[in-house]
Amino acid sequence: MSEISVIILAAGFGTRMKSKKAKVLFELCGEPMLFHILKKAYEITDNVNVVLHYDFENIKNIVLSKFPNVKIYKQDHENFPGTAGALKNINLNSQKTLIICGDMPLVKTAELKKLCKGETDINLSVFYAENPFGYGRVINKNGKILKIVEQKDANEQELKENCVNAGAYCFKTDILKQILPLIKNENSQKEYYLTDAIEIALQKKLKCQAIEVAEENFMGINDKFALSKAETIIQNEIKENLMKNGVLMRLPESIYIDSRAKFIGECELHENVSIIGSCVIENSIIKSSSVIENSHIINSDIGPMAHIRPDCEISDTHIGNFVELKKAKVNKIKAGHLSYLGDCEIQEGTNVGCGTITCNYDGKRKYRTKIGKNVFIGSDTQLVAPVEIQDNVLIAAGSTITKNVEEGSLAISRIKQENKPGFFAKFFKEIK
């Protein structure tokens, strides 16, 4: 039997999000909010459970793809709605059971561990709210907790209380098993509230303790405004940690960094940069208004206003303004401006001229372009894939390359220029 099990309640409909998408799947810094909570749970125990209902199969598959050992349960919402109803069919097999909500991504592991300490029968997380509206009130008399009343069921006097339920509990599991069958749905919503467990426990002379936690860490995400507030908080935490560990950021408040991104060595991010997905940035400079997605960048400078799309590997390279790469593997090259390099491999010493395009799509499928070492590509060149350019090749500006080019060659593909003397005056005279 494990010492602690964690149960994450994620069965709610999330109607205030005003979306068909399940609330716990809304992303914060690149990952679903439920993932943020699951990571914290696994820092406490390997015995982690999630209760779902709405969009069950979809959420289940998404969770198991990242956390394959999570035990997933489906709430019988028709017969047992509410937070206590969510626990009806769970296999409770630990000494203590920590119960947390799936919409509290800001919760800290240290506070959850504090909630699990001690020998009391029930530990309840509370905070003193400046504005308690919407929270369940923790009703007490002379410091003794009497009960928890939901906002919609509280009377006028109870609504004046500002000690509120933060939404996390730690039960001795044997106590939880005793209390769950005793919880009734005698309230305005006809739901089974886990908060009623406190009142039942006190009637049984069990020991209940309020554990004060930080309000900002237990903020529930109930609408998209709260979602934006939570993402701002997580962004600030990510950037503060990175800057303290050596990443230089200019105007950090304008920068977006995915929670999965990694930075190695001495890196620099300029204003309005977005780092999206599982990027790895090593000893590189990302200049103003550039976007990097799911790519690995080493010893390079990118931008300003460059777009590095997914699955790029860039090393010892200069990528300039208005250059877009996608599924590109490039090493020790220069692409200064206004180019699209997709589905390609470019080797060291190559210079990509302004306006170069790898034409990688024929309307049915994608094709790759291979470019060797020390290739000079003139401006306004189109490389129609599939095509291979071998080493030491010069491609004349304005060329459309449709055939492979052998090593050491000049490739030129354009109409011969013809000048017609006196044409300007003749042409405009006819117009008049």
Swiss-Prot record:
It is found in: Cytoplasm. UDP-N-acetyl-alpha-D-glucosamine binds at residues 9-12, 23, 82-83, 136, 150, 165, 222, 309, 326, 340, 351. GO terms for molecular function: glucosamine-1-phosphate N-acetyltransferase activity; magnesium ion binding; UDP-N-acetylglucosamine diphosphorylase activity. Residues 1-224 are annotated as: Pyrophosphorylase. The active site is at H337 (proton acceptor). Mg(2+) binds at D103, N222. It holds the Pfam family Hexapep. It is an enzyme of class 2 (transferase). Binds 1 Mg(2+) ion per subunit. PANTHER family: BIFUNCTIONAL PROTEIN GLMU, NUCLEOTIDYL TRANSFERASE. In the N-terminal section; belongs to the N-acetylglucosamine-1-phosphate uridyltransferase family. In the C-terminal section; belongs to the transferase hexapeptide repeat family. Catalyzes the last two sequential reactions in the de novo biosynthetic pathway for UDP-N-acetylglucosamine (UDP-GlcNAc). The C-terminal domain catalyzes the transfer of acetyl group from acetyl coenzyme A to glucosamine-1-phosphate (GlcN-1-P) to produce N-acetylglucosamine-1-phosphate (GlcNAc-1-P), which is converted into UDP-GlcNAc by the transfer of uridine 5-monophosphate (from uridine 5-triphosphate), a reaction catalyzed by the N-terminal domain. This is Bifunctional protein GlmU. The gene is glmU.
